[in-house]
């Protein structure tokens, strides 16, 4: 790999620390044609059909919903299709957070027929168990050169920029502008590389006016094999009832995930990294209202027959719970078993020797965007910060409530660099000898 010109590195650093006061002015220009396919804000009184776990429905969701039907997915899990007015989705998210101690918890659809079809066509059994690729660890020279380049200041700058928006709610102008700002920032990091493209994904019928963002690094040798690294770009405040001007900074949820992705991308671009496989960085729209953006993308990939060999979800990376000693937490449920083992092997190889530890826990049905890929039969995995940040979905989800730094995101970004390189591989690189994975150093802990 060639080293970047110093001016490119400087430009990248300046871009990462730009404030959205400037970025909003830039992002609001010239994207009307790109977002014209998106639908306007939904009617708050219109019915929305949610798919959630039967146990969640019986514990409390039923108080918010009216009609219901019970179905089973390919994993044999009992699921409920229930209807409620759109404005009650905020209450549903609040229930999941406050009562079940987690995020997400449901998929959302415009019609009952869509919701039922989603369950009938579920491929979660395939997504969780099938080995889609060999996952050898043989890129140590490249990974060890790139991992130390993760900079806390860059991650902090992106968190600050995104959380300075009034909100990134999917049905607000702020949410659309934030998405365009991310696309422009990622595009700027590519510095005109011909094998890199950045686009707004607008083929989502229920994402309101918020697009998702996809940056693609075309694989040099295996372009039809795709690696995805993603996180959601929207934010929400509990109890706001869909107010487009709600105060929802979402610094941890999930500006931190987008910032961590951005730092991984910056390092790849600054070092001229060229993968064998195609790598896609994704910022998903409308995660907070039923995993809408990621489901639309995963569905489009399935319809097109795209070959995805691995998906990594980064959702909340920057809160370190008092008393916690682990660097990160691997999500154990609704994820691909071979890919989870790959994460364990990566951690053992690259993170444990640096003194880090990892926990594992379940997060429940549809807790984040990896669940969209799993349900469509793709191999997906997620790791996060660990115990849940108590200020999620409130105006206090701010960087200063997390110590004012992005220190906790650094090891998650470093592991993300390893995931990108070891799964994407490196063009024309002589692989290092594969290693025998050592036992997982983590200590599994109860779910949160």
PLM features per residue range, with description:
Residues 157-218:
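A non-catalytic alpha/beta surface segment that caps or lines the substrate-entry region
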Residues 167-170, 203-208, 219-222, 233-237, ...:
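Solvent-exposed loop/turn segments at secondary-structure junctions
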Residues 115-172:
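N-terminal hydrophobic or amphipathic helices/low-complexity stretches enriched
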Residues 209-212, 245-338, 342, 365-366:
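Acidic/histidine-rich catalytic neighborhood of metal-dependent amide-processing enzymes
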Residues 141-150, 163-174, 199-203, 242-254, ...:
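Second-shell loop/turn segments in exported
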Residues 320-436:
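Active-site-adjacent substrate-binding region
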Residues 8-18:
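Bacterial N-terminal signal peptides
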Residues 155-163, 199-200, 212-216, 226-231, ...:
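Structural recognition of the beta-strand scaffold that forms the well-ordered cores
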